[in-house]
Design a protein with these regions (language model features):
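FAD-dinucleotide binding site
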Residues: 20, 100, 136
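N-terminal glycine-/serine-/threonine-rich beta1-alpha1-beta2 phosphate-ribose binding loop
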Residues: 1-88, 103-115
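ADP-ribose/adenylate-binding Rossmann-like module
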Residues: 86-98
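Conserved beta-strand->loop/alpha-helix structural units within folded catalytic cores of enzymes
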Residues: 68-70, 92, 119-121
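Predominantly a Rossmann-like dinucleotide-binding segment in NAD(P)-dependent oxidoreductases
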Residues: 2-3, 112-117, 122-194
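Short, well-ordered alpha-helical microsegments
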Residues: 29, 75-76, 98, 127-128, ...
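Short glycine-enriched loops at secondary-structure junctions
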Residues: 72, 95-96, 149-154
Length: 194
């Protein structure tokens, strides 16, 4: 799952201290604690079992960054709350579900002077960076039109998603739930917002 996988990645970043973990499901926090232990790192404070346990994590004084990898409908509210409590935030895609939520994140970031970053990994994968380099080197000539999409088949993971939230979005959008996965690399090739 996304959260414990992220914890494993963070253990490899020199100077990073993972001081608190939170998940609605206690067993996921325990899995992340095991990852810390196997990496030779100290246990982190644990928050779980309550819908609002994450707020207690955000209210701590010893946290600089809150990494948000929850169900999507909570991303924006969690990001806003964390920034309002003095934390920078890194939010898995999508960072928000509506334009109003996007503006809430932007306005809160500007008001609090805290960074808010949507974590869009697909613009940095091997294929995407190779294609971008080829476009920048002129291999394709002048690029005038680009299309992108991202279909994510999650059948093998259906039982792992709490309350089936992820599958509901996949069914509603036919699996193409990350516009940024397909369009982010396309925007890079076209030099949009660079």
């Amino acid at each position: 799952m996304r959260g414990p996988g992220a914890v494993a990645r963070w253990t490899h970043i020199p100077g990073t201290k993972i001081v608190a973990l939170c998940d609605l499901l206690p067993e996921r926090v325990e899995k992340s604690q095991e990852i810390l232990k196997n990496a030779g790192l100290p246990a982190a404070a644990s928050y779980s079992g309550e819908e609002d346990a994450w707020k207690k994590l955000c209210e701590r004084d010893d946290i600089d960054l809150v990494y948000i990898a929850t169900d999507w409908k909570h991303h924006a509210a969690m990001g806003v709350y964390a920034m309002e409590h003095g934390k920078h935030v890194a939010i898995e895609v999508p960072a928000a579900m509506t334009l109003d939520e996007i503006w809430q994140l932007i306005n809160t970031s500007e008001k609090t002077r805290k960074h808010c970053m949507q974590l869009e990994n697909c613009v940095y994968d091997f294929f995407e960076l190779t294609s971008l380099n080829m476009a920048q080197q002129g291999v394709f000539g002048e690029v005038l039109h680009v299309e992108g999409s991202y279909i994510h088949n999650l059948e093998d993971f259906w039982p792992e998603y709490w309350n089936n939230w992820r599958m509901d979005y996949n069914h509603l959008h036919r699996g193409d739930v990350y516009a940024t996965h397909g369009m982010g690399p396309a925007c890079q090739v076209l030099n949009i917002h660079r």
